[in-house]
Regions:
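Active-site PLP attachment segment
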Residues: 127-169
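Active-site C-terminal subdomain of aminotransferase-like
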Residues: 151-201
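Proline-centric
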Residues: 291-303
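Conserved glycine-rich beta-strand-loop-beta hairpin in the small C-terminal domain of fold type I
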Residues: 197-226, 235-249
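Short, conserved charged micro-motifs
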Residues: 78-81, 252-259, 300-306
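PLP-dependent aminotransferase-like
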Residues: 4-22, 30-107, 111, 119
Length: 323
């Protein structure tokens, strides 16, 4: 029986999601597990250059795993053919995997899965299984989209997200540092999550986002950073639509991150597991350690990008002075 009356709850927002016709799930990693169930996939070929949350989830689900390296252009170093039943998992690092490249791998291997965690605004291609993570681009507690033509025959419970909002609301009203440990605890709790339908809360919040404004702001900020760092940045990357971050390579990235944090410029490390386990000579170790994801998202304006440049160059100057 529907409740009527009493105190008011969060309003139903009147906008539209960017992806209205995809499967809505709780997390990117669980979207992958759900897809593997739908496809009957028993084995994945994963990049070494990958966060351990995906790896742990796949192992826990009993999926066999093999790994491949990437070169300095982030090109997968994979065999010419795959074993029967194996799916190639392609990560779109910083939005650099073009549609043409995806279609090349689809034609060559057939069984591919594309991870668009870094490329929310790159639309899926027909017949290509594609996964998106919502919380990497927006202030959300969870949420993922799955594009697939596989039949969703497996029933799922719906997720509940209200208890995961504390660090988001806390940073909005106060600051990031006060809620950093809460954010980590929240992320850690995802390890126990199974595939579920996206929560009503997350779906509702996704309806309240002005996506065209987000794209425009991210691209303006990216270009502003490129004016400061483009000549110094050795990475041959192109700006994707609505970029995730501005990836800036600096050969002492681990030390530089520590210095920038002291002046409240927080540059996350996305692949700590790679730094811990890869060989120091590998591309994976080099990029996980030394690519600095400079923030260019919709929270900021060009003047904020000026501040990013000022703080980063001050930290570089300080670091190079200590040589």
């Amino acid at each position: 029986m529907k409740e009527i009356g009493g105190y008011l709850e969060l309003e139903e927002l009147a906008g539209e999601e960017y992806y209205k016709d995809m499967y809505r799930l709780n997390l990117g990693r669980t979207a992958l597990l759900y897809l593997c169930r739908l496809r009957g996939c028993k084995k994945l070929l994963l990049p070494y250059f990958l966060c351990d949350s995906v790896i742990k989830s796949c192992r826990h689900a009993g999926i066999d795993l093999e790994y491949y390296h990437v070169d300095s252009n982030l090109t997968p170093q994979v065999p010419d053919s795959l074993e029967s039943g194996t799916y190639l998992y392609l990560v779109n690092y910083y939005g650099q995997l073009t549609d043409e490249t995806i279609l090349y791998y689809k034609k060559k291997y057939q069984h591919i899965i594309v991870d668009h965690t870094h490329a929310f605004f790159q639309r899926p291609l027909p017949g290509v299984d594609t996964i998106y993570s919502c919380r990497k681009f927006f202030g959300l507690p969870d949420g993922a989209y799955l594009s697939t033509d596989a039949s969703p025959v497996l029933p799922l419970h719906q997720d509940l997200s209200g208890s995961r909002m504390e660090h988001l609301l806390g940073r909005y009203e106060k600051d990031a540092a006060s809620y950093y440990s809460t954010m980590l605890d929240n992320a850690s709790s995802f390890q126990q999550e199974s595939p579920k339908l996206m929560s009503r809360l997350t779906q509702n919040l996704l309806k309240g986002i002005d996506y065209e404004r987000v794209i425009e702001r991210r691209e303006i900020n990216y270009r502003r950073l490129d004016k400061y760092f483009g000549d110094r940045n050795p990475l041959p990357f192109q700006m994707p639509r609505g970029p995730f971050t501005y990836p800036f390579y600096y050969p002492k990235g681990i030390k530089l991150r520590k210095l920038t944090a002291s002046c409240k410029l927080y540059l996350p490390t996305y692949w700590n597991n790679v730094i811990q386990h890869a060989t120091a000579e590998s591309v994976e170790y080099d990029y996980a350690s030394n690519i600095l994801p400079l923030p260019c998202d919709q929270r900021y304006n060009p003047q904020d990008m000026d501040a990013v440049a000022d703080r980063l160059y001050a930290a570089i100057k300080d670091l190079e002075r200590k040589k």
